[in-house]
Curated annotation (Swiss-Prot):
The lineage of its organism: Archaea, Thermoproteota, Thermoprotei, Desulfurococcales, Desulfurococcaceae. ATP binds at residues 8-16. This is Cytidylate kinase. Transmembrane segments: none annotated. The keyword Transmembrane helix does not apply. It is an enzyme of class 2 (transferase). Gene3D superfamilies: P-loop containing nucleotide triphosphate hydrolases. GO terms for molecular function: ATP binding; CMP kinase activity; dCMP kinase activity. Belongs to the cytidylate kinase family. Type 2 subfamily. The keyword ATP-binding applies.
């Protein structure tokens, strides 16, 4: 049984890569971000609005973290989430961080969510500020400290395919050991 975590900031490429890894290695896929989006949608809120609410209501993060941890315990899974590597660090076999500079991530988010660049920038900056503060306050986790990761990749100059090949080779080497 293997547990692989792919983390990173919004727009860094974690979801794209996590899905590809899960498919390639025939593993289950689970996204903490999708759960957060489901909660926002069910409450009729934007991600920005739910992030602000979550800053004062730890029950949202607690529920997401509980569900994420339960999925990790089942094994044979690729977990995708900004905080996931810290939440399941004691059972994750491989922890990978994918990122890109802010301007690249904002462009990707605008394209993915079909919104203009200014809105993507506004929402992303607020979301990241609130998340960083919330994660430190609730968990004592500095999400800028990447020392827990086995592999860190800046995807700015890499295609989706090249990024995947780096990740795939890293995982294959780990699985052979």
């Amino acid at each position: 049984m293997v547990v692989i975590v792919i983390s990173g900031p919004p727009g860094g490429g974690k979801t794209t890569q996590a899905r590809r890894v899960a498919e390639y290695f025939s593993l289950r896929y689970y996204s903490a971000g999708m759960i957060f989006r489901e909660i926002a949608r069910s409450r009729g809120l934007s991600l920005e609005e739910l992030s602000i609410i979550a800053a004062n209501d730890p029950s949202i993060d607690i529920e997401i973290d509980k569900r994420t941890y339960e999925e990790a315990l089942k094994g044979n899974v690729v977990l995708d989430g900004h905080l996931t590597a810290w939440i399941v660090s004691n059972i994750a076999d491989i922890k990978i961080y994918v990122t890109a500079p802010l301007h690249i991530r904002i462009k990707r988010i605008a394209e993915r969510d079909n919104i203009d660049l200014n809105k993507a920038m506004h929402e992303t900056i607020i979301r990241e500020y609130v998340q960083k503060k919330r994660f430190m306050e609730y968990y004592g986790i500095d999400i800028d400290d990447l020392s827990i990761f086995d592999l860190v990749i800046n995807t700015e100059k890499l295609s989706v395919e090249k990024t995947f090949n780096i990740i795939r080779e890293f995982i294959e080497k780990f699985l052979k050991e």
